[in-house]
Swiss-Prot record:
This is Ribosome production factor 1. Residues 136-319 form the Brix domain. GO terms for biological process: maturation of 5.8S rRNA; maturation of LSU-rRNA. It comes from Xenopus laevis. Its main location: nucleus. One of its GO terms (molecular function) is RNA binding. One of its GO terms (cellular component) is preribosome, large subunit precursor.
Amino acid sequence: MAEKKGPEAKKQKKMKNKSKVEETDAGEEAGASEEQQQVTRLPPAFSLSEIKNKQRRQFMFIKLKQEKRKEKLILRKKRKKEREALGDKAPPKPVPKTIENQRVYDETTVDPADEEVALDEATDEFAPYFNKQTTPKILITTSDRPRGRSVRFTEQLSSIIPNSDVYYRRGLALKKIIPQCVSRDYTDLLVINEDRKVPNGLVLCHLPDGPTAHFKISNVRLRKEMKRKGKEPTEHKPEVILNNFTTRLGHSIGRMFASLYPHDPHFVGRQVATFHNQRDYIFFRYHRYLFKSEKKVGIQELGPRFTLKLRSLQKGTFDSKYGEYEWVHKRHEMDTSRRKFHL
């Protein structure tokens, strides 16, 4: 058949092109509306991982995040308006859930008013210290042939523990060191272990009858490595703060740390040593108070700082062969829940 020529053919061609454009626009609009429906109305069992196209999956993920953020913002504004409208009658703000306040209850949690606890404290190994019958005298030593950071860390520890002496081991076993410490009236033995010139362990032995605690040490920061540090610590006796040692085991560890420092701190020196237990990690900090006015006070860290994790608690003095252990950390058996702590 012969094709039509002239103005009628041109008219028909324009009409066809116009209809095609309208169809494509309608198709795009339909596709966009479908996309919005997919973003806003996903089936309940739908998972973004089911989308095979990576770009499409990322796009959908971003959209979902944005929508959730908008919903949270709207809900927050609504609650704020309700609280402002109620004024003093508004209910108290809900306490946010944390691992600490969701902690699994431990049966060995210590009650300070318990008579049995008071009797144990009056007869345990630390009773002479708390009854002021003995004065702390500490011997700080290291593993054989210490190097680098371990040496500097040991020296800085002696500067923040009053009445402490540093002696480097020369191949002498701990079993031989302990009787010598007892004969020279030392009340505690502190041993810094190292691996590849880095401190990685701490053994604390209370003398003469124990107990002995073994800690993993990490995150050691010496004074030189700290920012905005204060001047060198003075010889004043510091205050000691023990936080969150709530269980029977934690109570024993807290008393062990307290027995390192002498009684009657010198408040003139404004120095404080803090042992803060959080999720079975013991954070040590050494600060100085800065009194800005009669009502305002600040703190300035002096260093060093480090973190301890209890590995074992042994009855009596150090004995790796025949020692009786009160508590040993068994990771695969004990760390079954993130909300269960031992200290």
